[in-house]
Amino acid sequence: MINITLPDGSRREFENPVSVMDVAQSIGAGLAKATIAGSVDGVLVDASDVIDHDASLRIITAKDEEGVEIIRHSSAHLVGHAVKQLYPDVKMVIGPVIAEGFYYDIYSERPFTPEDMAAIEKRMGELIAQDYDVIKKVTPRAEVIEIFKARGEDYKLRLIEDMSDDIQAMGMYYHQEYVDMCRGPHVPNTRFLKAFKLTRISGAYWRGDAQNEQLQRIYGTAWADKKQLEAYIKRIEEAEMRDHRRIGKQQDLFHLQEEAPGLVFWHPKGWALWQVVEQYMRKVYRKTGYGEVRCPQILDVSLWQKSGHWDNYQDAMFFTESEKRTYALKPMNCPGHVQVFNQGLHSYRDLPIRYGEFGACHRNEPSGALHGILRVRGFTQDDGHVFCTENQVEAEVTAFHQQALAVYQHFGFDEIQVKIALRPESRLGDDATWDKAEGALRSALSSNGVEWQELPGEGAFYGPKIEYHLKDAIGRTWQLGTMQVDFMMPGRLGAEYVDENSQKKHPVMLHRAIVGSMERFLGILIEHHAGQFPAWLAPTQVVVANITDAQAEYVSDVTKTLADQGFRVSADLRNEKIGYKIREHTLQRVPYLLVIGDREKENGAVAVRTRSGEDLGSMSLQAFIERLQAEGA
C-alpha cells in the first residue's frame, strides 16, 4: 500500500505505484486536466512519473510559479520542434528558462531573419493546435548518444560528453518526431503552451566564448494564459518607451560608440544629471560620518594578489604593463581604502572609521552582456568602507540600512526587498568565519524587524552581503545597494588597530554602496521616471522662452536670476513660434517652461507652464522661485 499525503494533510491510499497524473485523476477530472507536473517530497517531477513509496505530493498547475516555469521550458522545446521542421539542417544546442521567458541557441549556416522568426512562431501555433502529448522516455546514455548521432545533433553529443560518468540515463522528451534531452519536468500536452510569443533574435557563442562558433539565439516568452501574455506584452511596450538609450538620445544625455565598448560619453545635460546625484550622495557621506577619499585607478598586480582578487576575479580585470611591472585597472575600490587605513596607527577608540569614494572602476564584462549604461565596463561607484570592531557591526549595518532606505525613497522608489547573498563555492576563509559574517547580517536585519530572502551561493568571494532590490514604476526589480561583511581582506592586506588590551587586531571591514554603479543607477532613474524627472533632479529644470524679440532682454534677466539662485536653467531666444518652442521643450520633458510676452515683461512676471501642459498662469519670479524651492529644487 502506498500513502500519498496532499498539501491539506489528507491522505490517499493506492495498492500499486501511481503516477502524479493518476493521483490527480483520483481527486477529480478537472484537476487532472489542469495538471502540469508534481512536487514529490519537494522535488519537481513529470506528471507521468511514478511514485512507488509513501510520499507527500503537491500537484503543479499553471496557477503555480513552477507551472509557468515548466510552460516556458516546454515552449523552448517547441521552438526546437518548429525550427527542425522548417530548417532541418540546423543543429540544436540548449534551450533554458530565463526571467519571464526562455531562449533556444541554434547553430545555423545563415543568420535567422525577422521573417524566419515569424515563420517559426506560426509553425509553433500550428503544432500547439494539434494538441499532441509530450512523451517522456528515460533512456540509457549509450542509446541517447546513438539517437543524436543519427540525427546529426553534434552539440547535444558535446553536452553529453561534458556530463559526469555517473549519469547513465537521461530523460528524452518527444514532441512527435522531434526529441530533446532534458532533466525536465515538461508539460504533458501542448495545450498548455498557447500563451506564448517569440520576442527577438540575437547572436550568441557556444559556451559563451567569443572564440567559439557563433549561434543564433531565439528568445520568447510564455505564460499561463493569454491575459497574462497580453499584460506582459503591454509591459514590454512600456519598457521600450522608457528605454534609457532612447531617452538618452532624445534628451541628449549621453552616447556610446564602437571605439569604446562599455564606456559612456556623457553630454552636458547628462553630466548635469550625474552631478545632481553625486552631490546628493556626497551630502549623505558627510551626514553619516564618511571621510571622502580618492585612490589610484591603477595598482601593481601584487596588491591584487594579496587581496585575493587575483585568484578569484582576474578574468574580469584589465591589465597593462610598464617598465617590466604588471598593473591592473581596479575592478573594486576596497584594497585602496585599506591602504588609506594602513597609514598610521589606530586605536579601538578611533573605530569605526568610515571612508567613501566616487571610485572609477573597470571590469572586463563580455561584449554580449553590455547593455546601454545599465551594463558597462567602466563605471563609478558611491563606494564606502567601514573599519570597525565585531561589536560595532550590527550598529553600522543598522545605520546603513536606514540611510539606504531614505535615499531610495527620495529618488522615488517605495517598494524595496531585502536579500542576503550567502557564501559562494569559490571563496576565501573557513566556514567558521563565514558563519560569523552571515550571522552578523541576519542579526542586524532581525533587530530592525526587517524581513529578508536568502540567496545561497551568491555572496562575494570575501564575504556575504545584504542586497537591496527596488521595484520600478512598471514593476521591474533592480538590485542596487549592498552591505557586505568582510573578516578576511583586512588581514590579507595588513590592516590593524590596537584594542583595549594593547593587542593588535584586524578590524572588520564593511563594504557598502547605496546606488552602486552611478551609470547603472542613472539608467534605472531614466527608465523609472520615463525621462520625466522631478524638478529637483531634472538636468534642465526651467526653460525661459520669449514670444518676440522685444522680450529678449527680460528673458536674459530672468534666466540670470534663476541661474544665480543655483537652478539649472536655459533661455530659448530662437526666432520660432512660441507653440513650436512649447512643444519641443515638452517633448524634452523639461519640468517648467516660462513664457515671456509683453505683459510679463511690463509686470516683471513669468507665465508658467508645466511639461504636462498645465497652465499655472502668471506669477512673480519670486513666487516661482519659492515654488521650485518647495519641490526641493
From Swiss-Prot:
This is Threonine--tRNA ligase. Gene3D superfamilies: 3.10.20.30, 3.30.54.20, Anticodon-binding domain, Bira Bifunctional Protein, Domain 2, Threonyl-trna Synthetase, Chain A, domain 2. Binds 1 zinc ion per subunit. Pfam families: HGTP_anticodon, TGS, tRNA-synt_2b, tRNA_SAD. Keywords: Aminoacyl-tRNA synthetase, ATP-binding, Cytoplasm, Ligase, Metal-binding, Nucleotide-binding, Protein biosynthesis, RNA-binding, tRNA-binding, Zinc. Catalyzes the attachment of threonine to tRNA(Thr) in a two-step reaction: L-threonine is first activated by ATP to form Thr-AMP and then transferred to the acceptor end of tRNA(Thr). Also edits incorrectly charged L-seryl-tRNA(Thr). The keyword Lipid metabolism does not apply.
